[in-house]
């Protein structure tokens, strides 16, 4: 049987999301439950894959099935595509299986041409209708030119602005039919000017080009960035939805809106949305005109509003989740154009999940599974200091579109935001309105401020998804983009001016207001308590200071999975002694210098044990090459020479001798302990003495040090270092006359260690996968240099993700799995964890659960993310 590439809305349902995309599956589902949906069809995600396989062309079979879909639509709707008497006009919209707001392209009013426009006007002499037809036509030419033919929107915007200026009006709605007719002609001329061909008038050709454009938009730069950030595979493809147009811009009895069944910023159980009279859907979402609140719709269209409230209830009860809906009213009649589970802020996600359990819609397991772990990061984001905020006077106010507090220097373009942020500047991106092209700048900014657009504009939706503070629709701003400045309440802001914005209240302030850490609400505790019931993986933290350890404990960490000891050497009072050790000529001189460092290390470790209150602490012995600890500036070298009674030339010779061609694979990790066993001895004494002290002071704590040897690649190497550690530790314990248990394990960060894990496990009490180095060593590229070529790899579709941010499960993951399978049978008591940056990435945590790790360890602020991801992995496995 030939492939079925096209499904009408009557043939699908919500279980067919992978084939029909989210939008198509939900349109079919709404049709099935009897809601007012204009009847159209969906071209499948498989057709998108086929389009790319066929060299970015739509084959005849797909097109012929699409035309059968059009014939079905004609029959159901009683209109004909391209007909002069009763024309069927359609919208063509994308819809991937995962929601990607504003990332892909939409075309409205398709099927119009000069003849159809003339025939429509002839059939209805009402001047308002004539205005509507020309309005629809000029919109179609502009959208088609921009989305399908890639002629920039700006050329058309300039023509509109010029026309409004000539006519002395502020809004598009104030332009007359004659003005819009002139614009349509100007737009077609601009199209020809840009492309050298006439605007296509054949509706079938328009449709084919539009379908191709939606498929093509799956691979546009902003969609690729969004996919990479949201773990959406390139192979999924997008579906295309073709449906009859309903016109919110028909007259003043019509309108369009976007609404959420609950507040997407706070989670409060109340309808939140916006509505525009005499407008098309894109006007609300694109944020071109600032709309009115949804409640006002009751005054304008009482019957349609009453029906809409019923639809909201039906959808929430059907999907058991907060819904984001797009709808249009045409001549007072309601039509539903889309529904999906709404994007929401992290606080809203937690509140909605807890409320849905309380209302009987969800079980605790389902509530835990419905929250995106990455969003939890945003909960822990700063707010303004309350006292400083009270003393500050807002200059103006927009809509609080995405919560949090942001302050920084004003920049006006996405490129400037990226450039300034790369220099270490904190910036706030100020735009008339954002468009999907601004995504990289939005990611680099501390906050986003827009002049136009509501709570459902592009800026608002994307900022909420990224957890970036956003204030939208501040119409009091007088913007001069050309000269990179704006005025608000008489104050002029230029590039680099300091500004603060509050994404919760929408307030805008001059200058920088200090921020404080976020306060976590009750729902967070509830969700985390449920998550902890379901997860099997333990979650530890990577922390080198008591303050970090304490923060991580507050956020639920169950121990330290990685304490990097080298950070402790860099402090002013210790670095001198460590440099003395490096420059020493004999073992005795080295030991003498290390004895000066010992009390510092011991007090550091003691403070960490105290912060962890008996939870496990894994201490990694010295890892970086010694070259990193010596001075490279001549002034400091002179000081060191004077301190040590050496000549400058002698110090320079030592520094020079430590230089390496490839330090990442050089004299570092356990290789330092093999060359200088006295370093490992000193560190062992510090660890054990600190543990003995804390054990004596807190008899009820189970203090059991875990000593971790870095960068092992060979059993004999581990044996050598372990012998130094065990002899030193046992002597300390015997001298103190106490009973203290400790463990010696190793990092697995060299492929050879993973492949010989059955040998290494005979000497190791635990394995900890250092996936930062393991990724570097497996791929053979350096984390510090990969940025230079990774973008080219994304563009060429060689990689979809940064392997340093998201664990490479097929290569690095296979090495981890191999190490566990080889190690555990030899040493059944062996426990295994991960302490690279991947420990806080949800998809990597899920993989760690699958291969049977005992714990993951991540930075303190990612501990809640890992706890939730670990619970979701356990729930998904059931």
What is each stretch, according to the model?
Residues 361-445, 507-513, 524, 528-532, ...:
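Protease-associated
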Residues 241, 411, 428-430, 449, ...:
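Structural motif
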Residues 41, 451-453, 472-475, 563, ...:
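Short beta->alpha connector loops at strand-helix junctions that form conserved
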Residues 337-339, 494-542, 548:
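C-terminal domain-closing interface element
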Residues 93, 520, 530-878:
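Conserved alpha/beta-domain cores
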């Amino acid at each position: 049987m030939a492939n079925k590439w096209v499904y009408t809305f009557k043939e699908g349902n919500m279980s067919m999301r992978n084939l029909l995309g989210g939008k198509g599956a939900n349109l079919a589902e709404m049709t099935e439950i009897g809601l007012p949906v204009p009847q159209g069809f969906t071209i499948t995600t498989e057709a998108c894959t086929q389009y790319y396989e066929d060299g970015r062309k739509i084959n005849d079979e797909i097109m012929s099935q699409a035309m059968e879909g059009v014939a079905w639509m004609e029959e159901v709707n009683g209109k004909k595509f391209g007909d002069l008497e009763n024309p069927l006009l359609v919208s063509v919209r994308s819809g991937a299986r995962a929601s990607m707001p504003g990332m892909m392209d939409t075309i409205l009013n398709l099927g119009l041409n000069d003849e159809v426009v003339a025939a429509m006007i002839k059939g209805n002499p009402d001047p308002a209708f004539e205005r509507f037809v020309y309005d629809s036509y000029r919109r179609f030419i502009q959208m088609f030119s921009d989305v399908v033919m890639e002629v920039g929107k700006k050329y058309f915007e300039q023509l509109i602005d010029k026309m409004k200026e000539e006519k002395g009006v502020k809004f598009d709605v104030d332009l007359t039919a004659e003005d819009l007719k002139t614009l349509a002609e100007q737009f077609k001329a601009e199209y020809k000017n840009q492309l050298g061909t006439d605007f296509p008038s054949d509706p079938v050709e328009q449709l084919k080009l539009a379908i191709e454009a939606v498929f093509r938009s799956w691979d546009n730069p902003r969609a690729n960035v969004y996919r990479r950030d949201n773990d959406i595979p390139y192979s999924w493809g997008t579906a295309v939805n073709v449906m009859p147009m309903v016109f919110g811009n028909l007259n003043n009895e019509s309108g369009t809106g976007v609404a959420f069944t609950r507040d997407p910023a706070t989670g409060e159980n109340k309808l939140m949305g916006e509505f525009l009279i005499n407008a098309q859907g894109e006007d609300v979402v694109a944020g071109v005109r600032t709309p009115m609140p949804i409640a006002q719709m009751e005054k304008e269209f009482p019957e349609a509003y009453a029906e809409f409230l019923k639809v909201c209830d039906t959808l929430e009860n059907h999907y058991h989740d907060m819904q984001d809906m797009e709808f249009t009213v045409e001549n007072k009649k309601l039509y539903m154009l889309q529904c999906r589970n709404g994007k929401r802020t992290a606080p809203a996600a937690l509140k909605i999940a807890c409320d849905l359990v309380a209302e009987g819609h969800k079980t605790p397991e389902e509530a835990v599974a419905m929250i995106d772990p990455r969003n939890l990061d945003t909960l822990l984001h700063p707010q303004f200091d309350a006292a400083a905020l009270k003393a500050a006077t807002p200059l103006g106010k927009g809509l609080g579109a995405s919560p949090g507090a942001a302050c920084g220097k004003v920049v006006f373009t996405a490129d400037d935001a990226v450039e300034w942020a790369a220099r270490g500047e904190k910036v706030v991106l100020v735009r008339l309105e954002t468009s999907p092209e601004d995504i990289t700048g939005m990611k680099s900014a501390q906050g986003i401020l827009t002049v136009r657009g509501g709570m459902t504009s592009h800026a608002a939706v994307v900022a909420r998804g990224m957890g970036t503070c956003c204030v939208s629709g501040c119409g009091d701003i007088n913007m001069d983009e050309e000269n990179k400045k704006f005025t608000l309440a008489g104050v002029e802001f230029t590039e680099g001016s300091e500004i603060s914005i509050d994404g919760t209240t929408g307030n805008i302030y001059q200058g920088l207001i200090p921020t404080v850490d976020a306060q976590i609400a009750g729902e967070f505790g509830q969700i985390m308590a449920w998550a902890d019931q379901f997860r099997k993986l333990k979650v530890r933290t990577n922390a080198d200071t008591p303050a970090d350890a304490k923060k991580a404990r507050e956020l639920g960490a169950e121990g330290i999975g990685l304490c990097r000891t080298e950070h402790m050497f860099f402090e002013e009072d210790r670095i001198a002694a460590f440099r003395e050790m490096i420059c020493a000529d004999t073992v005795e001189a080295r030991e003498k210098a290390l004895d000066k460092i010992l009390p510092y290390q011991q007090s550091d470790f003691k403070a960490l044990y105290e912060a962890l209150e008996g939870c496990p602490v894994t201490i990694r012995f010295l890892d970086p090459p010694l070259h990193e600890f010596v001075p490279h500036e001549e002034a400091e070298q002179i000081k060191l020479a004077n301190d040590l009674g050496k000549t400058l030339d002698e110090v320079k010779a030592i520094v020079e001798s430590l230089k390496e061609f490839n330090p990442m694979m050089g004299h570092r990790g356990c290789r330092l302990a093999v060359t200088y066993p006295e370093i490992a001895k000193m560190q062992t004494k510090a660890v054990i003495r600190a543990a003995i002290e804390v054990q004596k002071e807190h008899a009820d704590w189970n203090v059991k040090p875990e000593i971790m040897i870095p960068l092992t690649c060979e059993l004999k190497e581990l044996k050598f270092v372990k012998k130094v550690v065990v002899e030193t530790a046992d002597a300390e314990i015997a001298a103190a006359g106490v009973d203290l248990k400790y463990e010696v394990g190793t990092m697995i960060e060299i492929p050879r260690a993973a492949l010989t894990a059955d040998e290494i496990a005979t000497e190791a009490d635990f394995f900890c996968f250092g996936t930062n180095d393991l990724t570097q060593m497996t791929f053979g590229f350096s984390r510090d240099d990969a940025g230079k070529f990774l973008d080219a790899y994304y563009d060429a579709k060689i990689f979809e993700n940064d392997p340093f941010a998201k664990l490479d499960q097929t290569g690095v993951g296979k090495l981890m799995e191999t190490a566990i399978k080889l190690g555990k049978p030899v040493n059944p008591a062996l426990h295994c964890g991960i302490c690279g940056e991947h420990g806080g990435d949800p998809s990597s945590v899920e993989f760690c659960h699958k291969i049977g790790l005992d714990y993951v360890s991540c930075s303190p602020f990612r501990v809640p993310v890992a706890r939730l991801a670990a619970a979701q992995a356990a729930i998904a496995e059931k």
